[in-house]
Amino acid sequence: MLAIISPAKTLDFETPAPNFPFANSQPKLTAYSQQLIDICKQFSPAELGSLMSISDKLASLNVARFAEWQLEHNEQNSKAALFAFKGDVYTGLDAETLTQAQVEYVQVHLRMLSGLYGLLKPLDLMQPYRLEMGTKLVNPKGKDLYAFWGDIITQHLQTAMDEQGDNILVNLASDEYYGAVKPQKLQATIIKPVFLDEKNGKFKQISFYAKKARGMMVRFILETQPTSVEQLKAFNYGSYWFDEDASGATELVFKREEQA
C-alpha cells in the first residue's frame, strides 16, 4: 500500500530532525527542480508576489530562497521532508513521535507530491521553498506545473508502487496536487478516503479537519500496516468512523459527530 499526501506551505528548518541511525535519502528529480529554480530566479519580489498571490514579505523571502537553492542537498542546507513540512496534515501525522521502525516503514509506503521536487520520499532531503502545484508558472513544457511535470510524477509513483509490493494507492492529497497524477496511466487500485465532520446537523468536508484527518490516516497506515482496502475501513483515529452506506468501492467515507 502506498499513500500520497500534499506538502505544506509552512516549513520548519530550525528544529533539528529526530536522530535515527540511518541516512537521509536524496531527492530523485532535482535536475527538474533546477529547471524550475532557474525560471523562478528571474522574478523580482513584486513579480513573484503577483504570480503566487503572496505578501511582499513572503515574496522577498522566497526570492531569497530561490537564490540560495543548491543542486547539492546535504545535512547543512537541507532537512528530511517528513520533518521539514508543517501544517494540518503533518500535525495529524505527528512525525516527531514516530519510532525508528515506523520511519523505515513510511519511507517505503508514503510519498509527498511537490511543485518543486515532483515526488519526495519522507526522508528525502529538501531545501526551503514555496512553489505550489497550482502555480501558473510558464515553462518550456507549457503554461503551468502540471504541464511541466507531465508523466514524470506518475512514472515515479508507479515505480514506488512496484517496489513496495502491491497496487493499492491511497490518495490523501488535495485536488490541487492530485491533479499532477495521471491515474489512467497507473496500474493501481486508487482509494480516496473522504473525511466529513458534522456541523449544524449535516456532515460536510471542513478543510482544517479534513487535512488533519489525512495525516491521521497516514499515521494509522504506518501503525497498523494494512494490506487490504478492507483493513483501511478500521480507521477510527480522532473519533472518525467508517460509513459503509455513504462509501463506494474506491471512495471510503469517514464521519465524525460534532465536537461538544
Curated annotation (Swiss-Prot):
Membrane-spanning intervals of the chain: none
GO biological process: response to hydroperoxide
Pfam families linked: H2O2_YaaD (PF03883)
GO-annotated cellular components: cytosol
Signal sequence, start to end: none
Disulphide bonds in the chain: none
InterPro entries recorded: YaaA
HAMAP family noted in UniProt: UPF0246
Family affiliation: Belongs to the UPF0246 family.
Matching NCBIfam families: PRK02101.1-1, PRK02101.1-3
Protein's name according to its UniProt entry: UPF0246 protein APP7_0648
